[in-house]
Amino acid sequence: MIGTRMARLALEYFHIEDADTYRDLIAFVECDRCLADAVVSVAHCHLGKRRLKWYDYGIMSASFYDIASGKAIRISQRQDVPRCPKGEDVVAFFNQFSDAELFHVHEVELPDFMEYDLPGKPRKTQICETCGERVHDGRGVEKNGHVYCKRCAGEHVYYVEGAELTAEQIAAGV
């Protein structure tokens, strides 16, 4: 419910009447909880459309950037908002609070936001000189005049790669 209210508040602030057809809103969510799903559902900002950015801060907040106006706001949950008691109707519980009682809203600037972060087709594609994989949207790492993906450049990645699977192994499954 918190994410739904945040997204609705952002749409209201930017005077967006039809989120389904509006293409100039980008959302930045700061957690991987239900808030993120609500922002996708209400504001129609999708990861695959490059209109949703996720930052793993573990915080129930989201920022919204309107490309058309160049303005951005960050909406965060006030800490004095009580939790919905177990067994109560979540919608009814949170509807008793105004947006001002639920949220802090601040204008923000996005200093790390780049042209490459905008929705649309990749503006730049590079090939990693080590593994040969395509690196899109300015995410390549340049070292000594060479371009690498983050993994090959030695930056932390979330996995350790094992042996490549054959077509037979894939068909057989786990």
Where do the protein language model's features map onto the residues?
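Conserved phosphate/anionic-ligand binding catalytic regions in large, soluble enzymes, centered on
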Residues: 1-10
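A structural-propensity feature for long, helix-poor, extended segments
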Residues: 23-57, 61
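C-terminal edge-of-domain segments
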Residues: 50-83
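Short, flexible, mixed-charge glycine/proline-rich loop motifs
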Residues: 113-125, 138-143
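Short cysteine-rich clusters marking metal-coordination/redox-active sites
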Residues: 128-132, 149-152
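Short, non-ligating residues that shape and space the ligands of small metal-coordination modules
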Residues: 137-138, 158-159
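Cysteine-rich micro-motifs
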Residues: 142-155
